[in-house]
C-alpha cells in the first residue's frame, strides 16, 4: 500500500502541470512525451492492480472504488475516442496519431517484426510468435458456426489478430495444413497452426528489405474502459453508475460495439457473471499487448489457467474442405509461489533483515 500510495501521490502532484494533449500533428516532434492523459492512465492501471485479489486479499471495496474513480477521471477528460479500425490502429504511423492512443512509443521505419513473425511460407518469414489454440477458441461466435470452417462467423478481432489456415495474408491464401506452404511440420514453422497478424504490416517485401514506421501502444482508451468496467463492477455492480457517466456494463459494451467489431452487447446481471465477462473481454481486446500474463497473476487465476496444456491444431486438406485436430503442444506449470518470484539473497542481506523472502522460496 505504501508503494501504491507513493505512486498515486506523485501522479496527483504532477498531473495538472502536464499538457493536456499534444494534438495529433507530430511534425514538431512532441509525440511520445507524457501528457495528463498518460499520467492518469498510469494511475488507473496502478490502482486497478492494487485492488485485485493478489494485492487485495481481503477484497477491500474502497480499493475498487479508488480504481473506478481513477478511470473515470481520465474518461471525464473526453480527449480520446475509440479508433474506427481495430486492425489499422496497430499499424504504422496511425498508432501514434490515433484518437484512441493515450501514449505510444514511436520507432523509425523497420521490418524486424515482420521478418520475425511472417509465416514460414512467405519469403523471409520466420514464424516467431505463434498464437495458441487456447486463445483462438476463446473468440466468440458472432453468427452461426460453420461446420466446414471453424474460423468463420467469429468475433472479427480474431481475423484482425491471428492468421488462420485458408485465410488471406501476405497476398496469398495461407496453407497451414499438412503439405502446405506454411505446413506446421516444416522447419521453423508455427507449432500451433497459427501465426501472428496484429501489429504486422501486410505484404512487406522482405527480400527487398521494405520497411514501415511502427509505434507501440503503452496506454489506449479501450484499456481504460475495461479498467473502469472491472472496478465499477467490483465496487458497485454491473448496472450502477455512482454518479459517473457510465455503468460497468455500458463501458464494456462500448469496447465490444466499436466500429468493425460490433459484438453483441453484454446483458449479464450478476456481479460474478460480469466479472468473467470482463476477464474474457480483456483477453480478446488486449491480446498480445502484454496484459494477459499480469492479469492472470493479479486475479490469482494463473495457477488454474497456466497449468493447462498449451494447444494447437493440425489441419488436413480434404478436397475443398479441411479437418482440424486439436493437439497438445506443450505442458505448462505455474505454482503458487510463482505469483511472486524470489528476491535475490544479496538484496535481503543488504537490508539487515528488513526485507523478507517471498513465500515458497
Regions found by a protein language model. Name each.
Residues 16-26, 78-84, 233-239, 260-264:
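Surface-exposed helix-capping loop/turn segments at secondary-structure junctions
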Residues 167-171, 261, 284-288:
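Intrinsically disordered or highly flexible coil/loop and linker segments, enriched in small
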Residues 2, 6-8, 91-144, 211, ...:
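Long, intrinsically disordered, low-complexity segments
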Residues 1-18, 30-55, 63-75, 103, ...:
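Extended, hydrophobic/aromatic-rich amphipathic alpha-helical segments that build helical scaffolds
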Residues 24-39, 87, 244, 267-270:
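A glycine-rich, coil/turn loop motif that links secondary-structure elements
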Residues 178-220, 360-361:
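Active-site beta-strand/loop architecture of penicillin-binding DD-peptidases
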Residues 22-29, 52-54, 205-211:
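Flexible glycine/proline-enriched surface loops and loop-helix/loop-strand junctions
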Residues 4, 8, 12-15, 33-186, ...:
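An aromatic- and glycine-enriched ligand-binding surface/loop that stacks and positions planar moieties
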Amino acid at each position: 500500500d505504501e508503494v501504491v500510495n507513493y505512486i498515486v501521490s506523485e501522479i496527483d502532484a504532477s498531473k495538472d502541470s502536464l499538457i493536456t494533449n499534444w494534438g495529433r500533428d507530430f511534425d514538431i516532434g512532441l509525440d511520445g512525451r507524457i501528457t495528463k492523459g498518460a499520467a492518469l492512465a498510469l494511475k488507473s492501471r496502478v490502482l486497478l492492480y492494487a485492488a485485485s485479489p493478489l494485492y487485495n486479499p481481503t477484497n477491500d471495496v474502497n480499493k475498487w472504488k479508488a480504481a473506478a474513480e481513477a478511470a473515470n477521471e481520465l474518461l471525464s477528460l473526453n480527449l480520446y475516442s475509440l479508433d474506427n479500425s481495430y486492425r489499422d490502429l496497430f499499424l504504422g504511423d496511425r498508432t501514434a496519431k490515433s484518437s484512441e492512443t493515450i501514449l505510444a512509443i514511436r520507432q523509425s521505419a523497420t521490418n524486424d517484426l515482420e521478418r520475425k513473425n511472417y509465416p514460414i511460407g512467405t519469403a523471409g518469414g520466420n514464424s516467431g510468435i505463434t498464437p495458441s489454440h487456447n486463445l483462438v477458441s476463446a473468440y466468440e461466435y458472432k453468427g452461426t458456426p460453420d461446420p466446414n470452417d471453424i474460423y468463420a462467423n467469429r468475433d472479427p478481432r480474431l481475423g484482425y489478430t491471428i492468421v488462420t489456415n485458408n485465410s488471406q495474408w501476405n497476398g496469398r491464401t495461407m496453407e497451414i495444413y499438412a503439405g502446405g506452404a506454411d505446413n506446421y511440420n516444416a522447419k521453423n514453422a508455427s507449432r500451433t497452426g497459427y501465426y501472428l497478424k496484429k501489429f504486422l504490416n501486410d505484404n512487406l517485401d522482405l527480400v527487398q528489405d521494405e520497411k514501415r514506421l511502427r509505434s507501440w501502444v503503452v496506454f489506449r482508451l479501450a484499456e481504460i474502459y475495461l479498467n473502469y468496467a472491472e472496478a465499477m463492477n467490483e465496487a458497485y455492480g454491473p448496472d450502477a453508475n455512482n454518479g459517473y457517466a457510465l455503468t460497468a456494463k455500458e463501458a464494456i459494451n462500448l469496447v465490444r460495439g466499436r466500429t468493425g467489431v460490433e459484438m453483441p452487447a453484454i446483458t449479464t446481471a450478476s456481479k460474478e457473471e460480469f466479472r468473467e465477462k470482463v476477464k474474457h473481454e480483456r483477453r480478446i481486446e488486449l491480446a498480445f499487448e502484454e496484459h494477459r500474463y499480469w492479469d492472470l497473476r493479479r486475479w490469482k487465476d494463473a495457477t488454474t489457467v497456466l497449468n493447462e496444456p498449451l494447444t494447437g491444431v493440425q489441419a488436413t486438406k480434404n478436397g475443398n474442405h479441411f479437418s482440424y485436430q486439436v493437439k497438445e503442444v506443450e505442458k505448462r506449470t505455474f505454482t503458487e509461489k510463482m505469483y511472486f518470484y524470489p528476491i535475490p539473497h544479496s538484496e535481503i542481506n543488504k537490508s539487515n533483515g528488513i526485507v523478507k523472502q517471498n513465500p515458497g522460496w
